[in-house]
Amino acid sequence: MGVMVRCLQSFGYILCIYTVRFALCDIYMSEKQRIQSGAETKETRSRLRQLVWSYSITGMPKEKYDPPDPRRMYTIMSSEEAASGKKSYWAELEISGKVRSLSTALWSLTHLTALHISDNSLSRIPPDIAKLHNLVYLDLSSNKIRSLPAELGNMVSLRELLLNNNQLRVLPFELGKLFQLQTLGLKGNPLAQDIMNLYQEPDGTRRLLNYLLDNLAGTKRVSTEQPPPRSWVHLKEPDRTRPAALFSVMCYNVLCDKYATRQLYGYCPSWALNWEYRKKSIMQEILSCSADIISLQEVETEQYYNFFLLELKEHGYEGFFSPKSRARTMSESDRKHVDGCAIFYKTEKFSLVQKHTVEFNQLAMANSEGSEVMLNRVMTKDNIGVAVLLELRKEMIEQSGKHLASMEKQLLLMANAHMHWDPEYSDVKLVQTMMFLSEVKNIVDKATRSLKLSSVSGETNAIPLVLCADLNSLPDSGVVEYLSTGGVDSTHKDFKDLRYIDCLTNFNCNGKNGTSSSRITHGFKLKSAYENGLMPYTNYTFDFKGVIDYIFYSQPLLNVLGVLGPLDPHWLHDNNITGCPHPHIPSDHFSLFAQLELLLPFSSLVNGLHVPGCR
């Protein structure tokens, strides 16, 4: 709808001669050349309508973004249509008429996606404009604006910001936070020459925004408060009536250096993405928890040997690492940048018995059974998992005044994996998880036989399991259902109706010769340490926030006593942190940390006699 308004009182006070246009479509922009130069031509309009914007100027992939026809169309609803209850939708507002000030009621129109306030007499823009968080297009050209509010930098949905022909002498550094901005119009402003020189370079908008963002943290207007400590969530008291061993586990995706780019994380300053800066905070995060066992994902090969292993050895750890399978075919210079999974353990509490690497592409090839989807979808992904079989040292065991049953050693299997990332490949993630659990079960079974271990209570799994992983799967996924419930049906929706059934039975806990069933099981009784929404998200980026990292432990031998809770959401909100990494948060993942209790066999008393074998 469009109407010429002389007295528009719904905005709180009279605004003289406003033109209000309400568009029925996604309102965006007129052509880019008009924005840059202040001129408009039919030729440029036609040419720019053919452009398809798929990436922001920082390179972050976004939803397809098509500039609409700049000749915006609108209709006026008739009285009959209004009387019949016809609903209107408008996402664009245009105000004209040499307006000098704006009503505060304007900031309540949070549904707006485009706001045209050019060719007026505005000298300032209120900070409340940031309340229009859905704006993708903002035209403030040809006014008398002398300064911009810092809050403008919080309008991270903006794709077009037009400031041509104003009286701006400086730009707030906060504008650098507009990482999705594709076009910035600055012509006709008395800005400093160094700013204009940067702006006029090829790809000048991106360069200028990067400059502003990189220098933002050095200004006094930015809060540099560290995030508050994460709270400890107590879940259960340890069992003091029997011998038990207490130990702690950390799971942490540290964000490999080669993935930490402005193309993926345009909201983070480049200096805060730099590995030399981030690695200090990452190590501080790891050491602050002082976990007995540490599982890391996205560890670069070179950084494992030259940084993580060296640093953690000084604090009493030993480690095991394997890179992704692609490292096999690379030169030595390229191989050192391949990421993988690592496990570290405190040598004062554990000794290494065995170590294993599980390559999913090799397992897929060996178990394809002629399945094309197994070969074409699973085998082509080179994710890996690692596992270490650890023996608890005697100093770890708390006897609690009870008699330990006769036992040669107490073992623990620690597994760590990183599944494929792409949301479109839920089938691959599920198959990778099945393959990993199948191999983990083989490790447990072989270790039990070769080391002649048996559960004194007759349980099939004498070796408890702790599984840490970046599963790249949400809690309602088939992957988590498979782990939590013991199995999943071969017709699960995450398989995408692709024919895996011929090869899935190879990963069933009963093996390919087991009982015929459409349900694929793993044979463990696993439980997540973080249940009931204890963590609202483990991965926190601008585009995605959700739980994809997990610590699972096997029952009944293991219990969780407590976990490290989430980062205070108020701190994130109050500091307008829309995604990580951040200068104070070195990865796009939050670490998980849990204290576990391992129940040990003990001898009970019957008529004053010790009877071994109780769990």
What do the predicted segments below correspond to?
Residues F173, S231-P238, E302, K349-F350, ...:
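Metal-dependent phosphoester-hydrolase catalytic domains
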Residues L186, V249-M250, L467:
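Residue-level marker for buried hydrophobic side chains located in beta-strands
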Residues Y252, L296-Q297, A417, C468-D470:
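Active-site flanking residues adjacent to catalytic metal/cofactor-binding acidic residues
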Residues L191, L255, E300, H420, ...:
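Catalytic metal-binding/acid-base residues of hydrolase active sites
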Residues L213-G340, Q410, T433-S438, N442-S455, ...:
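N-terminal, active-site-proximal structural segment of metallo-dependent hydrolase catalytic domains
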Residues M1-D128, N134-Y137, S147-A150, F173, ...:
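The feature captures the LRR N-terminal capping module
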